[in-house]
Swiss-Prot record:
Gene Ontology CC: cytoplasm; nucleus
Record keywords, A-Z: Cytoplasm, Isopeptide bond, Nucleus, Repeat, Ubl conjugation pathway
Propeptide position ranges: 229-230
Protein name per UniProt: Polyubiquitin 12
General remark: Ubiquitin is encoded by 16 different genes. Ubiquitin is generally synthesized as a polyubiquitin precursor with tandem head to tail repeats. Often, there is one to three additional amino acids after the last repeat, removed in the mature protein. Alternatively, ubiquitin extension protein is synthesized as a single copy of ubiquitin fused to a ribosomal protein (either eL40 or eS31) or to a ubiquitin-related protein (either RUB1 or RUB2). Following translation, extension protein is cleaved from ubiquitin.
Pfam families: ubiquitin
Length: 230
């Protein structure tokens, strides 16, 4: 029968197999086609990793089923890094890798300097010098990458439509400055913007620090139409 094999790069290959084939047999076929040694393969079907020695029939793999191929580097593991844009980066790492090492790998892939990267896992910011093992980061864990601009911070602005805008700001920025940044991103003129944080409307001329707005705070943007009464 025919089954499909999908790689992380999105490439799909067709394999000719029998239900009685073992996972070892399938990995040998993949080696013939792709040149990847079986000890570097992991095969996933219906969310389960397939074990050598078991057959396709054991896992109910049928005609036209799709298996997913993940690569396992000797002694290593794969983890995922999700960016604020929703993009997911796949990295090959070791448990003994430090957060510095990880940031260097992200720089290689994405071109983002390590000093602009903040990595979050299980709600905690990861510190340089600590290892993945220190944070109990295991295979296929997902980390979140937040960008830190030099000296600045990120805040979020949520609109009434539910859209969230990310802004790079300084604590010393005034509300006027923030409205100008929103105008640059969204095309909404400052005189139509009302910004709310912690239930208070922000006054032009005051700074983010005045309102105790810190990194990753969320402000709410309400539109004020010209001629409106508020």
């Amino acid at each position: 029968m025919q089954i499909f094999l999908k790689t992380l790069t999105g490439k799909t290959k067709v394999l000719e197999v029998e239900s009685s084939d073992t996972i070892d047999n399938v990995k040998a076929k993949i080696q013939d086609i792709e040149g990847i040694p079986p000890d570097q393969h992991r095969l996933i079907f219906a969310g389960k990793q397939l074990e050598d020695g078991r057959t396709l029939a054991d896992y109910n793999v049928q005609e036209d089923s799709t298996l997913h191929l993940l690569l396992r580097f000797r002694g290593g593991m794969q983890i995922f890094v999700k960016t604020l844009t929703g993009k997911t980066i796949t990295l090959e790492v070791e448990s003994s890798d430090t957060i510095d090492n990880l940031k260097a790998k992200i720089q290689d892939k994405e071109g983002i300097p390590p000093d602009q990267q903040r990595l979050i896992f299980a709600g905690k910011q990861l510190e340089d010098g600590r290892t993945l093992a220190d944070y109990n980061i295991q295979k296929e864990s997902t980390l979140h990458l937040v960008l830190r601009l030099r000296g600045g911070m990120q805040i979020f602005v949520k609109t009434l439509t539910g859209k969230t805008i990310t802004l790079e700001v300084e604590s010393s920025d005034t509300i006027d400055n923030v409205k100008a940044k929103i105008q640059d991103k969204e095309g909404i003129s400052p005189d139509q913007q009302r910004l709310i944080f912690a239930g208070k409307q922000h006054e032009d001329g005051r700074t983010l620090a005045d309102y105790n707005i810190q990194k990753e705070s969320t402000l709410h943007l309400v539109l004020r139409l010209r001629g409106g009464s508020f």
